[in-house]
Each structure stands twice: as structure tokens, then as C-alpha cells.
Amino acid sequence: LKIKGLYLKILVRTVDVSAEVVQGLSRGQNWSNLVKDICLKYKSIEKGNKQEVKREFFGANHFLHEYAIIKDVRLVYCPPQPMASYGGDDANWHWPRMSADFAILRAYKEGEDGEALPFSPKYYLKIKEDGIGPDEQVYVLGYPRGASYDWISADAKESFLLSMIRRAEVFGLRMGIINRNIQHLSAEDRLSWEGDLSSLNNERLKTLGRVSSFLRYMIPEKLIAREDSCGLLLHQNDIEKYWKFCNLKNKADSLVRLINPLVEFDDDYRDCVQSIPFINSAGLVKNKDRFSGNILSQLVDRVFRSSNVVMEKSVVKGLLNYLYQKNSIFIPMEIKDEKIGVDDYVDCLYRCSSLIEKDSVLSILSGNLSVQSDPAMKYLVYTDSIYKSDIGTNLVTYAGQLNEVREKILIMLHDCGFINWSGTNGTLRVSYGKTGTQCWSTNLNQDICKAWTSYGYKMVCDKSRDKQVILNFTTDCHTTGGNSGSPVLNEHGELVGLNFDRDVDGLCGDYYYLPSVCQ
């Protein structure tokens, strides 16, 4: 089955272009033109290849990576959906993880006569059929993206940790409302809301995991100690750099103090206001000229994928009551002025608004009907104006300045030997370690054949070949976002498994590399 838009990206060479980057930037050349010049200097090995220039080790090095691209990729096999998603997002970071979450693909290249031929790579991974045992050397090979930078001590201020706790609180609030009402829904409606529940719990667990691992392993204290040690070393060896380092730290702390009061407003806007269904439908109507007809239709389907008005009203009432109790600036003026209560406001809006039902929204999008006086549109305009005038602009400005300061601090920490890894940026990485003692195994034929037969597959159980096979195992390799599905190799270069997820404690690796937990 051909899959439009899917392609195979094969690394064919890497070139150190640090000298060219330094030379170009010193001449004042802008980045896009500099990359073009570098790609012209190192012409592609083959027509159709893709070249990327990536910065490594906080800007100490730059490399050109060239990839061969194969665009004809086809689906050969995937398990039944219930087996692929067994446990759902709720089971993330839990042991053992039992989902058959994989697919088998085949790539095709064009032959001399134009015929599509299966791609046969010069190098490939052999599968180790005997599985793997405890305490074996293993490697995770992949293109991670999740941990894009280390934190500095200014990032770990109380307000940032409280922000993550608030996010988890809102996720839990929405989950509680859905759980209380879901039993009253039809089987069809229940399915989409169960998907929402699973996604919300996934985000809640991830957020809480970051906070708990951050506090459990005293990451804020470790960040402070790392910077204090760097300052002491600079004071001994280079007093000028020491004062520069101190100034950067002071500037970071000042920027965080400016950002602090904005963070809670940003949380309210993103996690509450933008989670309200009619806000999203009003946004589509307001911004319809930005999208083509096909994309707009897909967005409408997405907004109304779980269209049950009773459930939606319950969720909206819960979110607005949450904002009202904390006296948020995003509470509608009618409620703020005590002209109407939260529940009555929501009931009235759902009676009067033409942006609640999918068919009505589609009709508005296809015509020129004005909805400026629609209560849902008025609330969207009200909340957007507050965010853009008082919060969004300042937050983007201060966050941009903090990013620049953070990077300079990280470079100094790297140069002094306190950071020895580069942020994951989608380039090829290998992490290494050993398998743990936790292994979960089953009888290959008897148990698996029985399970798959229940899905309609005709599978014969050959008792003579029945043997124990390890289906789940742990390693102490470092993985991060983007590593799901990455191949796990043994010391002979054989494929022994696919990486799925970290232990919940390892989530602190998104911001701070702690080998005892993250590796």
C-alpha cells in the first residue's frame, strides 16, 4: 500500500564545515546564504539528495549532513489496531509495555527501465531471533528531538515548576469531567472521548513525571551547583570571563522575574481557553482565509471529532469555573461583572451561538454570513485581545532574550567541561548501556497464536518449535522524545528490539542529563 508523503531518509555522508561557518559569520553573511554556499561547495553525491547544516556542541562545531531520499515507501504489514494501541497512552512509562506498536514498510527505487524495484541497501541490520538476556551490551540508534537544550538554574525557578503542576491540574480537571459524564454517551461518541481521555492522561503523567523527577533528584540544586563550580573555575583561570558569566546569570534571573507573572496567564490561555471547543470553531471562521478549502475541511472535522453538546458544555463549565475561582483575566466580562453565573453563561452561549454545530459552521465557512456579534466569536476576540496586548508580545520578547542568554551560559559551561553532550536536534545519535534484569517473556507459538487467532488470523501452533521469547526488556540507555521506535542493537550489530519509552524518572532528561537516571 503506497503511503503518500512518507519517505526514507538515508545518511550518506557527514562533513565538518565548522571553518566555513566561522569564516562566513565573521564576514557578516546571513545564515541562509551561508548554508547555500556550503551546499554549493560540497555538491550532492547524487541528484535528489537532501543536505542540512546542523550546529553541534552549543555552536562549537557545525556539520553538513547529506541524505539520500527514497519517496516510494509502502506499507507491508501492521498489527490490528487494538493490539497496536493496547494499553493506550495511559500505559506510557509503565512496565511491562505490551502494545504491538510497529509497522513493516518496504521502500522502492526506480530501475533502469522505470520499473519500481525493492530497495536493497548495502548495509542492514540482521534480526537476532534468539532474543536477548539480562546484562547484555546494547545501543539505541536514532534521531531524537525531545531534549533540545539543557536548563540553567534560572529556568528551574519555582514559577516554572508551578506552571507544570498547573498544567497537570487542568489535565486532571478535564479528565474528571469526562469520566463523570462518559457513561451517558453512545458507544460511538464514547470512543472519541476515550481517545481524549487517553491523550490527556498521557500529558498529565508526562508533566507530573518531569516535576517529580526534577524534585526527587534535586535538579534545581544540581543546576545551581554546576554554575557555582563553573564560576569558581573561571574566577581562578580567567577573571574577565568570570565577570561575563556573572553578568549573564544576573541577566537570566532578571528576565525570569519579568517572565514569572506572565507564565500563569499563558497557562490559562493555552490550557483552558484554547481547549474550549467553540473557541476553536470561532477561530476557524475568523481565520478561514488563511487555509485552503481542503485543509479547512480537515480542521473542521478535527474540531468536531467528538461532537456531543452535553459533554462539551460540562467541560466548558468546568474550565470557566476553574478560571473564575482563580480570578483569571480571561473570565468573560459578563461573569466578571457578576451579571450572570458561569453555568448560566455557558447554557446561554450554547443556545444562542451558531458556532456550536458542525453543519452550521460549515455553512458559515462556505458563505459570507457575519458572526461578529455571535457570543462565541465575541469571547474569542476578547481573550485574543487580552493575550496579544498584555501577555503574548512581552512573553515572546523576554523568552527570546532569555534563550540568547541561556545559550551563552551553556556555551561557557560546555567550554569549562560541565556539559559534555549536545542538544538533540534530529541528527543521528547512539546511546549505549546494558539490558536490565527486568524481562517479560511468553511462549512464542502457544500464547501468541492464540491471541492472534482471536483477530481472525489462521495461525498454526507448532508445539515442537514452542520456546520462551523475551518480548519486553529494560536498558539503561539514554532515550528522549523522538526515540520511540528507534532500533536497539546488541554488540554484534544485530537488531534485538525497538525502543519504546523511558521510565517516568527519566523524564528529567528533557532538561537535565543525569546519567544515573537518564542513561
Enumerate the language-model features and the residues they cover.
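Terminal presequence/propeptide segments associated with secretion/organelle targeting
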Residues: 1-519
